[in-house]
Amino acid sequence: MLIFRQLFDPQSSTYSYLLGDARACEAVLIDPVFEQARRDAALISELGVKLVATLETHVHADHVTGAWLLQRQLGSAITLSAASGAEGADRYLAHGDRVKFGRRYLEVRATPGHTQGCVTYVLDDESMAFTGDCLLIRGSGRADFQQGDPRAMYRSVRSQILTLPPACLLYPAHDYRGLTVTSVGEERRYNPRLGGEIGESDFVGYMNNLGLPHPKLIDIAVPANLRCGHPEKDAALPVEPGWAPLTFTFAGIWEIQPDALEENAANIQIVDVREPDEYHGPLGRIHGAKLIPLGVLAARTGELARDRPVVAVCRSGARSAQASILLQHAGFNDVANLAGGMLRWRAEGHAVEGGQA
């Protein structure tokens, strides 16, 4: 079975794509974003797959790649086009190469035009392709910087992408209107820049008169991406919480396991967000836990110290996850949710006050 997830970075409107072989438990990630690396690593962990490689469709100008961060955390190989000009990759790709994950693979098609090193990745059965910034949904990427060439882009799209089967689904690196997927058949017919009977000279004339401003992050993103996302020597690396062993979930929440909470409880504020009848009910409560029901937590955050870590607790971990987000938005920096809540706490034999034996 193929694992497929389309992931989104709202800051840069970038799509990243996770593809995996469920039976072999191997996966690849196309166009990871630096700020989303923690999220992506959490998803990969939850799906139980090994990330064997990150793949870039090109050297991006609007965001920094998460390739190096993911390699640092998960050991994945950094992979991109040999024509990209980037340094520090583990594998440089050429037209016709294959990137394997389990029994599946992506075929590399050189599609220069947006940049000189653009590639499109085509799944082995040609059911889907990942077009980067070369072909967008009812549009195309720009071709006015980073060795861009509108003639090359036109030829790339016409010869390497729109020659795929009509039913082949196309997934771009960006969309700014909330669109998520298109198909070869649709783009052949409806793409106003590259579809139908539009000729090369028509496309070149259109692209040469776009007059677009350069991406805001180009002076940061391009140099960083030419290093495959590796930070400069004096740059600060993302800091993991050091007050307890925590796990970052795909839901965007830090979780603490019962054993870790028990071991570090002396330095932690525990806030129980259940209702009073639950707090005094059969499950009991953790020693020292302060009762502040979720419904009134926003109004009572002043009762919690901001210079000490906070762990939110409820029956199962659902309400306390919401409480964790609320506290983060209220300016608390060190917040975690008790994984599994009081149900798991008791099931694992940790001490409680009150409750039924």
Region spans (language model):
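Active-site metal-binding loops of divalent metal-dependent hydrolases
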Residues: 32, 59, 83-84, 114-115, ...
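Active-site HxH/HxHxD metal-binding segment of metal-dependent hydrolases
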Residues: 13, 24, 34-110, 127, ...
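Accessory terminal helices/loops
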Residues: 155-169, 173-259
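Divalent metal-coordination and catalytic microenvironments
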Residues: 19, 31, 58, 70, ...
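Catalytic cysteine-centered active loop of the rhodanese-like fold, especially the PTP/DSP P-loop
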Residues: 294-347
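Conserved beta-strand hairpin/beta-sheet module of binuclear metal-dependent hydrolase folds
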Residues: 1-50, 121-132, 138
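Core dinuclear metal-dependent hydrolase active-site scaffold
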Residues: 6, 18, 98-124, 128, ...
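Positively charged, proline/Ser/Thr-rich regional signature most characteristic
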Residues: 235-312, 316, 355
